[in-house]
């Protein structure tokens, strides 16, 4: 059994902020298993690695003997979380929310322990709440308090509309903690206002206020913007293992350490520190660290054998040796007369523009099935299939079809 100090170290790994740390320590000291809550609005059907930052932290609480509550915001999902938004988010239909919620339940147990997980829906209590009850709840905070939120303040100052239902969202999320009697609530750094709302409402309803633990927002594949499906810089946890491996191997070396801190169970803090020292000293290649992480992620969301097969496929491309047929086949539509190589690279998503493709070709940084291609006039038409590689990290197995 972990000591209090060991528990605090594991809980604090990668965390941005814990409010209040002394309250968390006191609750851990009591020896009573904590009720740890995190809410997810089912606004899209699939989860990605950015979502797993919170799920991973929930799993760590489970490993310490605590009960976690995976709260599906089927009610709040129909409101639309305004956090960080400059415009009003379009609410989802009940049918969309429920369809997405079903896929969430299937995916989360790739990480969470079923025996220590409650799956709850906040329509359980809000579906029974009367209009009078909702008005009483809304009376707990003022418009002035709501305008303390950065996103609301910016929209108000910029004379952008703020719908009344958006003001209700933090209150509704906060009341979830009351309904669930949460001891701890987890959320991203963009959720701090909403999480603190839960503390205040719990005190109002005579409960001990929950501890708030915020986690950083995971940067996506570009290493800059928050991981997001809309930006295309994400890895979905339901993606094929080969995609998980190849995408992970493309991330920048600096981002690797961030991902290890927030996504890895297998690489301890001490081991990550040793890896950093070895890389800095030239005794370890950053690629090998990245491969360790890629193997862990592919195994977690698939299995060890599938992960090894995916790694073999990735290795076959980067070395020019081995079987590349395990790589996913991407169909690219081209006109009957075909495309020149620069246009093909752009159409396949391997370069952002034809000018960048031309630059890569002149640098002899483009290979097709392991052979360097630098003929700018070379044409490819329907029926072509092969592995195209741009630089060391960017590649795809493509098949050209008539558009």
UniProtKB/Swiss-Prot annotation:
Principal location: cytoplasm
Catalytic activity, EC: 6.1.1.1
Keywords per UniProt: Aminoacyl-tRNA synthetase, ATP-binding, Cytoplasm, Ligase, Nucleotide-binding, Protein biosynthesis, RNA-binding
SUPFAM superfamilies cross-referenced by the UniProt entry: Alpha-L RNA-binding motif (SSF55174), Nucleotidylyl transferase (SSF52374)
Residues reported to bind ATP: 229
Motif ('KMSKS' region): 226-230
Keyword Nucleotide-binding: yes
UniProt key word Acyltransferase: no
Transmembrane intervals: none
Every S4 RNA-binding domain range: 339-400
SMART domains: S4
HAMAP family: Tyr_tRNA_synth_type2
Protein name: Tyrosine--tRNA ligase
Gene name per UniProt: tyrS
């Amino acid at each position: 059994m972990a000591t209090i100090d060991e528990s605090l170290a594991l809980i604090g790994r990668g965390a941005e902020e814990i409010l209040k740390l002394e309250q968390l320590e006191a609750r851990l000291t009591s020896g009573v298993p904590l009720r740890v809550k995190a809410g997810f609005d089912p606004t899209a059907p699939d989860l990605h690695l950015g979502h797993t930052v919170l799920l991973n932290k929930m799993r760590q609480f489970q490993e310490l003997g605590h009960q976690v509550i995976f709260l599906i915001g089927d009610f709040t999902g129909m409101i639309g979380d305004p956090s960080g938004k400059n415009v009003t988010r379009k609410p989802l239909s009940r049918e969309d929310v429920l369809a997405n919620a079903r896929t969430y339940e299937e995916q989360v147990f790739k990480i969470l322990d079923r025996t220590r997980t409650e799956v709850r829906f906040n329509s359980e209590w809000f579906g029974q709440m009367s209009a009078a009850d909702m008005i009483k709840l809304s009376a707990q905070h003022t418009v002035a308090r709501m305008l303390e939120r950065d996103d609301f303040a910016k929209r108000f100052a910029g004379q952008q509309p703020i719908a009344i239902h958006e003001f209700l969202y933090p209150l509704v999320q906060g009341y979830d903690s009351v309904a669930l009697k949460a001891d701890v609530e987890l959320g991203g750094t963009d959720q701090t206002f909403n999480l603190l709302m839960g503390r205040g409402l719990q005190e109002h309803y005579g409960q001990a206020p929950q501890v708030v633990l915020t986690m950083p927002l995971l940067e996506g594949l570009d290493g800059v913007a928050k991981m997001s499906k809309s930006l295309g810089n994400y890895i979905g946890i339901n993606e094929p293992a080969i995609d998980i491996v190849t995408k992970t191997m493309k991330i920048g070396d600096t981002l690797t350490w961030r991902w290890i801190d927030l996504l890895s169970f297998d690489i301890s803090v001490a081991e990550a520190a040793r890896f950093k020292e070895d890389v800095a000293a030239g005794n370890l290649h950053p690629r090998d660290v990245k491969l360790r992480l890629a193997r862990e992620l592919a195994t977690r969301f698939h299995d060890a054998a599938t992960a090894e097969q995916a790694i073999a496929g990735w290795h076959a491309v980067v070395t020019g040796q081995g079987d590349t047929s395990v790589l996913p086949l991407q169909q690219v539509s081209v006109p009957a007369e075909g495309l020149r190589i620069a246009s093909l690279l752009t159409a396949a998503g391997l370069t952002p523009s034809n000018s960048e493709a031309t630059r890569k070709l002149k640098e002899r940084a483009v290979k097709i099935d392991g052979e360097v291609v630098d003929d700018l006039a070379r044409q490819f038409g329907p029926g072509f299939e092969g592995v195209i590689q741009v630089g060391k990290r960017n590649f795809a197995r493509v098949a050209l079809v008539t558009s």
